[in-house]
C-alpha cells in the first residue's frame, strides 16, 4: 500500500474488522506482471459492487453510496433539508435513475434528531466501524478531515457502513494522541508527515506535493490534503461536525456498546501475541516479493523494521498495537491518552511507485539494494525469521498459493486486480 513500509496495514485492518463482524472486501496479495514487465507486489482488493453486495446482503437492489467530502456536501451526513440534489458529496452508485434519496435523507434526519436510529441504521456495525477506526487511528475515513473512504448501503430503508481504503491505518494519515471519546477532534501531526528514517527526507516531497495540481494527484491515485489544510498540507485538529459519531456516542446505551468494542480490540487483537503471530505470518509470505519488488516504496530494511516483533521498536506494528491498547485501556478507566502515533506516519506524498509522481530523490540501485539486503538478513536473524533471498537467489521458500496469487494468465490482470482500489499499491 501507498506510504506503508510494512505492506500490511490495510490487510491487517480488514482482517480485524472482518473478525469483528463488519462487512469488508476480500483481499489477497498478488505478484503482478503485465506483458512480461514486473510490477511487483500489490494487494488486490475486492470492489464494492453487485457481487460484494450479494455476498453480504439478502437484497441487492438498495441504494449504494460512496460519500466524498472533498468538493461536495453531505459526506459528513449532516442534515441540511430535504433537497437531495443539494448533497453533492453523497455519490450514489446504484439506482441512478430510480432513487429519490428519501432513505439517505431519513438517515441524516435521524442522526440530527437522535431518534429512531435503529430503524435507519445498523447501529451495531456503525459502532464497530467507529471503534475499529479509532483503535487503528485511521483518520483518512469518515472520522477525519477528508470524510471519505467508506460506503453506505441501504437495505429496506436501513443503512450499513462498509469500510474502504485502509492503507493509512495505524496512524499513517497523521500523528497525534487519539481521544476515544472525541475522535473527530484528534490532535494530528500533519498530513503524511515525512519519513524520519530515510535519506529521501531531503527531496522535499511534501513541499512538491503541495504544488502538484489536484488533477495530477487524482491521476496518480495519491491522497490529497483536506479542504481546510494550509499550504503545507497541515489539517486543522477538528474534522467538523460528524453526527454518525457524536449522536451515537451521546447515547448512553450506544456509548457502552462502543466501549465494549474497544475493549474487544484491546483484549483480542491489540495484544503482543496476536499481532506478533499475524505480522510474522504475513511477513514470511510476502518478504521475498517485497525484497525483489522493482517498484518498492521503501527499502527492504525499512520493511523489516516495520515488521519487527520487538514491542519497543517505535516504527513497528507490534509496538503500535501494544501502546494503543494501553492508551485505550487507560481512557476506558477514566484516564487520558498515553500514546502519540507520530512515529507511525508514512512518507507523505512521496514514494516513487509504478508510474507515480516524481518528487525527487533516486531509487536505490542494485548495489545499494544488495547492501540493504545484507543488513536486513542480519536483522531477520535477530528476529528469528527466515532471511530474504539475495537479488539472484530467486524466491525459494516464499511461494504464494493460488489464493494469494493474482489469478493472472499471460501477464494480464483481471478486472478485480485493476479496480480493487486505486491506492492498493504495495
Write out the residue ranges for each language-model feature:
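Active-site acidic catalytic loop and adjacent metal/ATP-binding pocket
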Residues: 118-172, 321
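Surface-exposed patches in mature extracellular/periplasmic domains of secreted proteins
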Residues: 24-31, 117-123, 141-142, 269-277
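Short, solvent-exposed loop/turn and secondary-structure capping segments
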Residues: 9, 42-44, 53-58, 139, ...
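A conserved long alpha-helix in the C-terminal portion of kinase-like catalytic domains
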Residues: 187-195, 227-282
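Disordered, low-complexity segments in secreted/periplasmic proteins that are enriched in proline
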Residues: 173-240, 339-426
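Soluble non-cytosolic domains of exported or imported proteins
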Residues: 3-11, 94-102, 121-126, 248-256, ...
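Histidine-centered catalytic/metal-binding microenvironments
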Residues: 287-352
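Internal "kinase-insert"/substrate-recognition segments embedded within catalytic cores
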Residues: 1-2, 18-25, 37-136, 181-219, ...
Amino acid at each position: 500500500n501507498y506510504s506503508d513500509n510494512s505492506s500490511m496495514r490495510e490487510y491487517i485492518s480488514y482482517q480485524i474488522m472482518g473478525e469483528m463482524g463488519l462487512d469488508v472486501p476480500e483481499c489477497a496479495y498478488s505478484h503482478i506482471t503485465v506483458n512480461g514487465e514486473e510490477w511487483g507486489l500489490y494487494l488486490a482488493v475486492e470492489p464494492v459492487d453487485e457481487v460484494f453486495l450479494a455476498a453480504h446482503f439478502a437484497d441487492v437492489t438498495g441504494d449504494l453510496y460512496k460519500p466524498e467530502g472533498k468538493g461536495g456536501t453531505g459526506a459528513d451526513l449532516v442534515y441540511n433539508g430535504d433537497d437531495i440534489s443539494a448533497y453533492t458529496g453523497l455519490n450514489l452508485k446504484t439506482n441512478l435513475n430510480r432513487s429519490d434519496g428519501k432513505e439517505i435523507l431519513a438517515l441524516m434526519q435521524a442522526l440530527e434528531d437522535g431518534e429512531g436510529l435503529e430503524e435507519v441504521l445498523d447501529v451495531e456495525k456503525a459502532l464497530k466501524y467507529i471503534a475499529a477506526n479509532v483503535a487503528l487511528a485511521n483518520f483518512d475515513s469518515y472520522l477525519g478531515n477528508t470524510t471519505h473512504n467508506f460506503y453506505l448501503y441501504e437495505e429496506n430503508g436501513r443503512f450499513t457502513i462498509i469500510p474502504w481504503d485502509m492503507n493509512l491505518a495505524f496512524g499513517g494519515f497523521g500523528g497525534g494522541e487519539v481521544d476515544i471519546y472525541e475522535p473527530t477532534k484528534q490532535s494530528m501531526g500533519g498530513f503524511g508527515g515525512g519519513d524520519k528514517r530515510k535519506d529521501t527526507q531531503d527531496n522535499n516531497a511534501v513541499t512538491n506535493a503541495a504544488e502538484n495540481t489536484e488533477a495530477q494527484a487524482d491521476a496518480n491515485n495519491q491522497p490529497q490534503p483536506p479542504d481546510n489544510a494550509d499550504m503545507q498540507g497541515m489539517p486543522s485538529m477538528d474534522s467538523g461536525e460528524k453526527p454518525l459519531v457524536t449522536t451515537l456516542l451521546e447515547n448512553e446505551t450506544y456509548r457502552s456498546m462502543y466501549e465494549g468494542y474497544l475493549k474487544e480490540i484491546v483484549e483480542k487483537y491489540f495484544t503482543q501475541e496476536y499481532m506478533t503471530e499475524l505480522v510474522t505470518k504475513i511477513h514470511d509470505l510476502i518478504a521475498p516479493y517485497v525484497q525483489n519488488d522493482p517498484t518498492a516504496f521503501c527499502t527492504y530494511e525499512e520493511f523489516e523494521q516495520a515488521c519487527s516483533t520487538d514491542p519497543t521498536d517505535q516504527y513497528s506494528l507490534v509496538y503500535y498495537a501494544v501502546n494503543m491498547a494501553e492508551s485505550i485501556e487507560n481512557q476506558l478507566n477514566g484516564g487520558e491518552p498515553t500514546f502519540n502515533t507520530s512515529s507511525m506516519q508514512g512518507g507523505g506524498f512521496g514514494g516513487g511507485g509504478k508510474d507515480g509522481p516524481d518528487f525527487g530523490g533516486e531509487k536505490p540501485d542494485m548495489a545499494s539494494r544488495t547492501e540493504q539486503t545484507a543488513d536486513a538478513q542480519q536483522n531477520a536473524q535477530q528476529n528469528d525469521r527466515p532471511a530474504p533471498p539475495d537479488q539472484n537467489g530467486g524466491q525459494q521458500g516464499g511461494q504464494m498459493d493460488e489464493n494469494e496469487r493474482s489469478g493472472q494468465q499471460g501477464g494480464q490482470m483481471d478486472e478485480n486486480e485493476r479496480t480493487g482500489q486505486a491506492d492498493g499499491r504495495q
